[in-house]
């Protein structure tokens, strides 16, 4: 079938619009290699895809604000974070952990752990989680270094998608 206007009984039918909800997506990145201290957020320096008013971010900050702008009881977002991680030169070789944090609290269900064999040995991590924001409220989400030492983060990518 055609998805355009056609004559039906002498009337013109307007074109069909297919909404795939991709207008509610935002992507924030940091292509540089940055040192992130233990317990701190990964800074996001570029906005690859700007979101609508329900996703708010300030360039260079590590925090993204999700707003519950909805007519339903809650707005649901899918939040994902990926990066390459390594222990910097001079650090102790041990497990590296990073997690998504909601309002500053790391999520155990969205924690990535890798154990490198040596310093400067990069591994790729990716975590994702669904976040529900009550109508009229706001939550902050971030990617946090939950390791016990400073970690290098390279090519960080933070994606927020409004799913309902």
Model region roles, listed by residue range:
Residues 1-24:
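Short, Lys/Arg-enriched N-terminal segments with co-localized hydrophobic residues
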Residues 18-164:
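Extracellular jelly-roll beta-sandwich "head" domains, especially the C-terminal globular C1q domain
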């Amino acid at each position: 079938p055609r998805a355009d206007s056609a004559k039906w009984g002498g009337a013109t039918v307007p074109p069909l619009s297919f909404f795939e909800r991709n207008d509610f997506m935002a992507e924030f990145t940091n292509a540089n290699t940055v040192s992130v201290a233990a317990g701190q957020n990964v800074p996001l320096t570029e906005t690859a895809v700007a979101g609508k008013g329900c996703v708010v971010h300030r360039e260079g900050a590590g925090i993204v604000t999700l707003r519950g702008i909805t007519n339903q009881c809650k707005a649901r977002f899918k939040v994902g974070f990926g990066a390459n991680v390594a222990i910097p030169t001079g650090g102790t070789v041990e497990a590296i952990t990073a997690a998504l944090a909601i309002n500053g609290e790391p999520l155990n269900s969205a924690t990535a752990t890798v154990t490198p064999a040596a310093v400067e040995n990069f591994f790729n991590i990716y975590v994702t989680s669904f976040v529900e924001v009550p109508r009229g409220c706001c939550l902050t989400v971030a990617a946090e270094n939950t390791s016990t030492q400073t970690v290098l983060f390279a090519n960080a990518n933070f994606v927020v998608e409004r799913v309902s």
